[in-house]
Amino acid sequence: MAYDWRKEEYEVTRPGRTRIDYRQEIGRAHIPIGIEREFTVLDPERAEALCAWVSTLIPARGERPAAGDVGAAEYVDATVFLTPRLRGVLLDGIDTIDQLAQERAGRRFAEATPLERTEVLRAFEANDPLDAFPMVRDLTYEAYYAHPRVLDVLEQETGWRYEVAFSGGELEPFDEDLLARMRTVPPRWRKT
């Protein structure tokens, strides 16, 4: 990965393509997990294909829901909405898996069987010039394993309870007079 100081971004190149490092981009987006939302970037056909994609990555098993059932596809869409440079990567990835499904199974990706979808995704992952597959995979895992419904099932299965690390702890009472000097310091920001 090379840093292009003229463009002020990291870029990774492969023969014939320049691709953006999606990890740098998605770090700028914060999407709450577990909230129902609508698709904003994808049209209905692509949204259906993305739901099938994430549900193929993490299918339903026992009490555990499929990734598509807990809003992982909508989470990917919302993340890409906040990082416009990745929209083309996602759209190209969805169009490519649909094309591969047409070639291999004779139907759209969303209409293919789970086995056909798995084969299509393996072929796509092996020759993915823009890193759409790892981007969707990483965002799917993030949305799935932080979803309250999935965490409840994991707690029932294992007894392990997830505690949100960034929620902060209880602040012990202290003498507020210790903050007197800080209250006199001028702000360190500029009003706009």
Predicted segments with their positions:
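Charge-rich (often acidic), low-complexity intrinsically disordered regions concentrated
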Residues: 38-41
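Mature-region segments of soluble proteins
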Residues: 1-21, 31-35, 47-48, 52, ...
